[in-house]
Amino acid sequence: MAKKITAFIKLQVKAGQANPAPPVGPALGQRGLNIMEFCKAFNAATSKLEPGLPTPVIITAYSDRTFTFVTKSTPASVLLKKAAGVTSGSKRPNTDKVGKVTRKQLEEIAKVKEADLTAAELEAAVRTIAGSARSMGLTVEG
């Protein structure tokens, strides 16, 4: 018989830097899960990623106080800000432009995000990322 799922916990944790401090500790502690076990497993799973990049993770908690987790790719907004060299998006995206991204940068971001996007082909994924860039106040070149 399969284990009974008690909760899905969605968090954004910096790659390779999970520790028992908030938000990880309280979210797992109130479900009775082993916090240090998660931290070690998450840090090992994200060791190949650039340290400090926020990484979404979905933790499945079971009734016997065990868990599994799935990491997603870094949010597109974070990757776009990094590519454009800005710290935040525009407060008025249609009037105030804060930076530029090239078509090549969009393709690289689309390849990173490919598994999490529903786009059937790379071109559609690039258009999705370009839309995110425009909504942040970035100019898309190319």
Swiss-Prot record:
Keywords: Methylation, Ribonucleoprotein, Ribosomal protein, RNA-binding, rRNA-binding. NCBIfam families: L11_bact (TIGR01632). It comes from the Bacteria. GO terms for molecular function: large ribosomal subunit rRNA binding; structural constituent of ribosome. Forms part of the ribosomal stalk which helps the ribosome interact with GTP-bound translation factors. It comes from Xanthomonas euvesicatoria pv. vesicatoria (strain 85-10) (Xanthomonas campestris pv. vesicatoria). It holds the Pfam family Ribosomal_L11. InterPro entries: Ribosomal_uL11, Ribosomal_uL11_bac-typ, Ribosomal_uL11_C, Ribosomal_uL11_C_sf, Ribosomal_uL11_CS, Ribosomal_uL11_N, Ribosomal_uL11_N_sf. This is Large ribosomal subunit protein uL11. Belongs to the universal ribosomal protein uL11 family. One of its GO terms (biological process) is translation. GO terms for cellular component: cytosolic large ribosomal subunit. Part of the ribosomal stalk of the 50S ribosomal subunit. Interacts with L10 and the large rRNA to form the base of the stalk. L10 forms an elongated spine to which L12 dimers bind in a sequential fashion forming a multimeric L10(L12)X complex. One or more lysine residues are methylated. The lineage of its organism: Bacteria, Pseudomonadati, Pseudomonadota, Gammaproteobacteria, Lysobacterales.
